[in-house]
């Protein structure tokens, strides 16, 4: 169902990911799918990775055997299509299975201050 009141409205949507990418649920995968759909519909998508979700911005993070989705690849595709991705700088050394591994190009090392500014400036804030 198409809602005419939504036509022409561009929203700034911030999605904050917290969970380990491959935690035996589809929470992160569905968050990335939502981001892709919103981006495709013309919205300004901002993604902030913190806690164990920072692994999603690391090339060393691979899908476990039997999992049919590559979340790192999905995140890179979102960046290539215009989504802005920031990753907690403090979490780089503290969080994830791959702590201290670098973030890939396009995933900007960021701060809590930058996240707080995004929260204030976004029309919608979602957490996953």
Where are these regions (language model features)?
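C-terminal structural segments of small proteins and small subunits
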Residues: 97-117, 121, 126
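Short, Lys/Arg-enriched N-terminal segments with co-localized hydrophobic residues
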Residues: 1-10
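Short glycine-enriched, charge-decorated loop/helix-capping segments at active-site entrances
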Residues: 61-65, 102-105
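Short, glycine-rich nucleotide/cofactor-binding loops
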Residues: 13-29, 57-62
């Amino acid at each position: 169902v198409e809602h005419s009141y939504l036509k022409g409205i561009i929203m700034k949507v911030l999605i904050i990911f917290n969970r380990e990418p491959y935690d035996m649920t589809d929470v992160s995968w569905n968050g990335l799918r939502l981001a892709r759909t919103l981006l495709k519909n013309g919205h300004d998508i901002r993604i902030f990775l913190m806690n164990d979700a920072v692994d999603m911005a690391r090339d060393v993070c691979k899908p476990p055997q039997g999992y049919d989705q590559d979340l790192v690849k999905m995140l890179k595709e979102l960046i290539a299509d215009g989504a802005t991705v920031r990753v907690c700088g403090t979490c780089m050394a503290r969080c994830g299975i791959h702590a201290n591994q670098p973030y890939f190009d396009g995933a900007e090392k960021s701060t809590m201050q930058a996240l707080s500014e995004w929260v204030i400036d976004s029309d919608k804030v979602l957490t996953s």
